[in-house]
A protein has these predicted regions:
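TRNA-recognition modules of translation machinery and tRNA-sensing kinases, especially anticodon-binding
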Residues: 2-303
């Protein structure tokens, strides 16, 4: 049997057993073995948390006004998910519900709420830190995690619409933010080696919207603002981004009025880990039987 056949069979087995398919593409149930590995990854990432790092955990929704102010709506409207609800009188809502049996479309009665689905874990961090006042030039560090949503419906393994994102965020002087990002780039290569997965670390860009977005993506690569750690999950030709390392310059500093203690606009950076993608990459690399994984990998994950 060829390597390609083994790979295809393994991917199909992950999709049907380690993950459980649902009626929606990119929305899967997670099994006990999957969650065991997620737990190990979470602990491994936590072991690298710097002393003094603040820990924040968020639900999968956030303020719509906050997201609009952050610039996400302008840059990524095609990925956004909004929370809507039925509004009106009891009679009007009942009519919509009962009309469903007659083939009427009840979603016409939906109205947007003040909530959206969180697209990135770090978005809720910046206004919280800004509200506290100036930050030291040496930086404020935050460990943040959230379930996130991006409207990327796909049958491709690892391309989930709802997923868990863990991030370390740095807010401080420009040189502090850059040094933080560079440190995590190097550390991520060590982590990937420790996990026994093949990888490449490359300059990257975000999927900005529209024609103007293509120019933004080019500028992002040219300025080396974003790097991704890629692991070949579905294929060598189109590896999956499982970690990213981003330098936002003064974008969030200007947006939220973040200042360092010398009065300058704060710069920000983050190291982001796609926990579900990393877990899928581990099963794709080492097989479905966790007990048969290399001892060094099991030791790293404490499983």
């Amino acid at each position: 049997m060829s390597t390609a056949q083994v790979s295809t069979e393994r991917l199909e087995a992950i999709t049907s057993s380690i993950l459980q398919p649902t009626a929606a593409n990119g929305v899967q149930g997670r099994t006990a073995p999957f969650e065991e590995v997620i737990g190990g990854l979470t602990a491994l990432i936590t072991s690298h948390r710097a002393p003094g790092t603040e820990v924040l955990r968020f639900p999968p929704v956030m303020s719509r006004a906050l997201l609009e102010k952050s610039g996400y709506l302008k840059s990524f409207p095609h990925l956004l998910g909004c929370v809507s609800s039925l509004t009106g009188t009891e009679a009007s809502i009942r009519a919509l519900v009962e009309g469903r049996a007659a083939g009427q479309d009840w979603v016409d009665g939906l109205a947007a709420t003040d909530l959206v689905l969180t697209p990135a874990a770090c978005y809720q961090v910046y206004p919280i830190i800004a509200a506290r006042g100036d930050v030291p030039r040496s930086g404020v560090l935050v460990d943040v995690e959230s379930y996130c949503f991006r409207r990327e419906a796909s049958s491709e393994l690892g391309r989930m619409q709802a997923f868990r994102m863990r991030e370390y965020v740095c807010i401080g002087a420009p040189d502090t933010a850059v040094a933080f990002r560079e440190k995590w780039k190097a550390r991520a290569e060590q982590l990937a080696t420790q996990l026994g997965v093949p990888f490449t670390l490359v300059p990257a860009s975000d999927p900005f919207f529209g024609r103007a977005g293509k120019l933004m993506a080019v500028n992002q690569v040219e300025q080396a603002l974003k790097f991704e750690l890629l692991i070949p999950v579905n294929s060598e030709e189109a590896p999956t981004a499982c970690m990213s390392f981003n330098y936002h310059q003064d974008h969030f500093g200007n947006t939220w009025g973040l200042r360092t203690d010398d009065g300058a606009v704060a710069h920000t950076a983050c190291a982001a880990f796609g926990l579900d993608r990393l877990t899928i990459a581990l099963f794709a690399t080492h097989g479905l039987d966790v007990d048969a994984w290399p001892p060094s990998v099991r030791e790293a994950l404490c499983i």
